[in-house]
C-alpha cells in the first residue's frame, strides 16, 4: 500500500525508500529463519516428529523461507507500481523452471532433497525476475545491508550449532529450544554490531525497545 500510494503521487524517491525498507525487513526475518532451519534441521525434526529422518527434507526446504519471502515482497512492489501482469508472468516462468527441476532432480539419487530444491528454484527464479524488473524501473536495493544480514545470520547459525552441541547431554527438546533461544539472542545482538540496525531502528522493535533507554 505504501508503494502504491507513492506511485499514485509520482514520488519515486519515496517509492525507492519504501522498497528498500521492505526488502531489508524481509531479509531481516527470512534469512535467519532459513539459516536456523538449515543448521538445526535434524533437531527440529526430532522435536516435532520424534524422529530425525525428516531432517533432510527440513534442511533442503529451508532456503524456501527466504526465497518465498523475496518473491512475495517483490511481487507486492511491482503490483503497487501498477505492473500487475509482470509478477504473474514471472511466476509462470518460475513454475516452468520448477517442472524442469522436478524432472531432473526427483530421482533415487537426490531423493526428497531434489523435490525440495525444485521448489527453491521456483521461488528463486520468480524472485530474481521480479528484482530484475524492479531494476528496470530504477528501483535499487542496498545489497551491502543484505550482505551484512547474511553475515549476521551465518554467525547466528554457528551459535545455534555450538549451543546445541554444548547442551547435547540434556534432553533433545531442551537442547533444541535452548539453541533456538541462543541463536535468536545472538542475532539481535549482532545486528547493530554488523551495522545492520542502528539504535533508533532497534527502538522500533517491540521486544527490544524495552531494554533500551
Predicted regions: what they are:
Residues 20, 36-66:
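Interfacial segments at transmembrane-helix termini and the short loops linking adjacent helices
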Residues 18-38, 47-48, 91, 95, ...:
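Short alpha-helical transmembrane segments in multi-pass integral membrane proteins
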Amino acid at each position: 500500500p505504501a508503494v502504491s500510494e507513492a506511485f499514485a503521487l509520482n514520488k519515486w524517491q519515496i517509492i525507492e525508500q519504501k522498497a528498500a525498507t521492505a526488502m531489508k525487513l524481509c531479509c531481516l526475518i527470512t534469512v535467519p529463519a532459513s539459516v536456523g532451519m538449515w543448521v538445526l534441521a535434524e533437531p527440529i525434526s526430532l522435536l516435532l516428529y520424534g524422529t530425525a529422518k525428516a531432517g533432510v527434507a527440513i534442511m533442503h526446504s529451508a532456503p524456501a523461507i527466504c526465497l518465498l519471502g523475496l518473491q512475495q515482497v517483490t511481487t507486492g512492489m511491482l503490483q503497487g507500481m501498477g505492473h500487475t501482469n509482470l509478477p504473474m508472468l514471472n511466476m509462470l516462468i518460475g513454475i516452468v523452471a520448477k517442472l524442469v527441476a522436478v524432472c531432473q532432480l526427483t530421482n533415487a539419487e537426490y531423493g526428497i532433497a531434489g523435490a525440495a530444491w525444485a521448489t527453491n528454484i521456483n521461488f528463486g527464479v520468480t524472485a530474481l525476475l521480479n528484482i530484475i524488473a524492479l531494476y528496470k524501473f530504477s528501483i535499487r536495493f542496498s545489497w551491502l545491508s543484505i550482505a551484512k544480514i547474511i553475515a549476521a545470520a551465518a554467525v547466528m547459525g554457528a551459535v545455534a550449532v555450538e549451543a546445541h552441541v554444548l547442551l547435547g547431554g540434556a534432553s533433545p527438546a531442551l537442547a533444541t529450544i535452548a539453541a533456538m533461544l541462543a541463536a535468536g539472542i545472538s542475532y539481535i545482538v549482532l545486528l547493530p554490531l554488523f551495522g545492520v540496525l542502528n539504535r533508533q531502528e532497534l527502538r522500533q522493535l517491540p521486544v527490544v525497545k524495552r531494554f533500551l533507554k
